Amino acid sequence: MSNGTSVKKRNGSIEPLNLEKIHSMCEEACEGLAGVSASQVEIQSGIQSYDGISTAEIQEILIRSASDLITLDNPNYQYVASRLLLFSVRKSLYGRLRELPTLEAHIVDCVSQEVYDPEIYSKYSLEEIRKADGFIDHSRDFLFTYAGLRQVVDKYLVQDLSLIHISEPTRQAEI
């Protein structure tokens, strides 16, 4: 269902705003959690869509909305906010929410983008990388609280600082 507004997807394409996708995302984030409501997250978000709003911006609004609903009486919203943040991270990193790449494929991709140093191949054999991949259980990502996942994202994920605009206030020479 669209209201005539278009959204800009993370890959740069433009498509009509689909409110059902927002609802489905909230439903999935609330799945299996007691005392939470996808509709409440949507209502709390008060999304004021405008033509050309990015899907990343919509996701951030939903994350803040769920985060704002965390209270002593409604603690499970911390998991709703965490899941919404996790969906955002996965979409940004891999372009999808499910069917995540193997550790080997992730390393190859990061080396090709010059995020990782190629020296990683001299430190770990392919066998070791594949063995490590066998220990990764992505379903455990859903055990993070919002505060925990936010800290991992903000402090420990590799950030592309070239995308951050840093400006220093103009200083006037003292005479």
Language model: regions and residue ranges:
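Often metal-dependent polyanion-binding catalytic scaffolds in large enzymes
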Residues: 1-19, 23-162
